[in-house]
């Protein structure tokens, strides 16, 4: 099986490059800017220790763990404060502001598993851009698959819980979600 789009060594094949994420940063930033403008993304300045403490407190109280709702402290930071903190060199990531409700379902057709119904994502304002300026898999998947006209994604079933995050991001950007197929790896520890 030969891909119809790729970059390998000195050979570039396809119409939708560049194919290396670090060469697509301006593209990702344009989409992030749009999400910030419509109130669906925000900078988060929480340190690793703060997030670990949050998780520990949620576990102790037998709550669902995650950076969401009232626990997402940076959701309410004003644009002015965020700009000041960024200009002062404070480290940050960009998070997607999920509007999911656990009681609502996202229904979609998985091409190998059939019609599936999963609760909307309401416990994770997923990181879209790391503090290194590169996008995370979740965000790159949505942007790249749209721009590269990907219609079908085949991946391991360990990614099934992420479908709700991805579909919500596609919809927030006004993009058509791809079709998914989630396959179980054989009895090995290989990941698809």
Question: What is each of the regions a protein language model found here?
Answer:
Residues 15-26, 38:
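Short coil/turn segments at secondary-structure boundaries
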């Amino acid at each position: 099986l030969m891909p119809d789009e790729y970059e390998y060594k000195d050979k570039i094949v396809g119409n939708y490059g560049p194919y290396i994420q670090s060469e697509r940063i301006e593209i990702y930033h344009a989409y992030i800017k749009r999400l910030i403008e419509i109130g669906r993304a925000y900078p988060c300045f929480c340190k690793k220790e703060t997030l670990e403490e949050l998780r520990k407190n949620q576990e102790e109280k037998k709550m669902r763990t995650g950076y969401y709702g009232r626990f997402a402290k940076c959701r309410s930071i004003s644009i002015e404060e965020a700009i000041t903190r960024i200009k002062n060199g404070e480290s940050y990531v960009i998070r997607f502001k999920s509007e999911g409700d656990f009681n609502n379902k996202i229904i979609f057709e998985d091409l190998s598993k059939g019609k599936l119904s999963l609760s909307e994502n309401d416990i994770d304002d997923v990181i879209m851009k790391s503090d290194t300026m590169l996008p995370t898999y979740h965000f790159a998947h949505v942007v790249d698959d749209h721009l590269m006209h990907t219609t079908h994604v085949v991946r391991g079933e360990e990614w099934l819980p992420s479908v709700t995050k991805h579909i919500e991001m596609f919809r927030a950007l006004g993009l058509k979600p791809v079709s998914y197929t989630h396959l179980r790896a054989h009895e090995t520890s290989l990941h698809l």
